[in-house]
Every structure is written in C-alpha cells, then in structure tokens.
C-alpha cells in the first residue's frame, strides 16, 4: 500500500473517501474532503489551511494543480464529474457539476461556474466573475464566448470517465 501525503492542520485532517484515488506525490493539508471515486494526481496540492476545500464524486484534479482559499473571503468547492486539467490554480472558487477546466487556467476568489461549463486552457477567471451553466469561457480575463455544444458535453463526460478508469487501474497496480 502506498502512503498518501495527508497532513493535519490545527486539528483538521483531510477526509478521503475509501474509493477515491490520491497519488502518493499529491499533498493534502487541513480541511480537505475528497469524494467517492474522485482522483488527485501527482504534484497536486490541496492546502485547506484558511478554509475548506471540497472535491466531489468522480472529479479529477490533475498533475500540478493547486487549490487554496482566502480566509473569510472565499471557499473552494469543485462539483461532481469535473475534470480539472494540469497546472490549474483553484483559488477560492466554486465549480459546478460536470465542468472541464482546461490546463493552466486560473480561477480566482469567488469566481463561479454553473454546471456543464468548459474553460479553455490558459484562461484567467478574475475575482467575483459568475458564469451561467453551459458557458464556454475563453481568455484573460475569461469571458463567455458562446454556449457549450452537445459534442463538448460529450467530451466533458468522456474526460471524467477516462480519468475514473485510469484511477481504477492505478489502484489495481496496473
């Protein structure tokens, strides 16, 4: 069995569902909750020392992501069946269910995504920006350029399911 780097902070210990996968090179600190069949990949850091971070069921937090919170200003909640791409920064934001956040994007304090949003790689969501469901978001600062298509919704579903399958393979030791 591989040990997972879980660190308590001021008596708060990360809670990881027994079916979740957390890579041994990830780091979870403080008030972190990881839901059923979620996956946290190498070099991801979820540092909940200023407030809670919640990762819902079947969501993947990919390599090099950083999640944090600004004390008394924001919270970080990621909905179910989301894909958070490599090197994304989640800083005090709320992501609805079935969203895809593209690689290298930055979501700042109190930014909110409705369900089925697609954030293009490298986008910057500035503080307090709120996006309705099915928004395709692009740029720096991020703006809604159109509605997410049915094909993109299929891709979002394919993405979280493929990471769920990969996590199962890692748990088996394949």
Feature roles, as predicted:
Residues 18, 23-24, 29-30, 35-36, ...:
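Left-handed beta-helix
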Residues 2-15, 74-89, 97, 136-174:
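C-terminal segments of enzyme domains that contribute to small-molecule binding surfaces
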């Amino acid at each position: 069995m591989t040990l997972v780097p879980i660190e308590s902070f001021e008596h708060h210990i990360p809670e990881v569902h027994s079916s979740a996968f957390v890579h041994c090179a990830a780091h979870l600190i403080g008030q972190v909750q990881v839901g059923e069949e979620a996956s946290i990949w190498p070099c991801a850091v979820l540092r909940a020392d200023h407030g809670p971070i919640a990762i819902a069921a079947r969501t993947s937090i990919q390599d090099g992501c950083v999640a944090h919170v600004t004390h008394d200003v924001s919270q970080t909640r990621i909905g179910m069946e989301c894909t958070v791409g490599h090197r994304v920064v989640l800083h005090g934001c709320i992501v609805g269910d079935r969203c895809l956040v593209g690689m290298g994007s930055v979501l700042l304090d109190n930014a909110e995504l409705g369900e089925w949003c697609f954030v293009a790689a490298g986008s910057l969501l500035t503080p307090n920006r709120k996006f309705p469901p099915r928004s395709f978001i692009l740029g720096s600062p991020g703006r809604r350029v159109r509605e997410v298509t049915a094909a993109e919704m299929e891709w979002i579903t394919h993405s979280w399911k493929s990471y769920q399958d990969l996590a199962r393979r890692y748990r088996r030791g394949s």
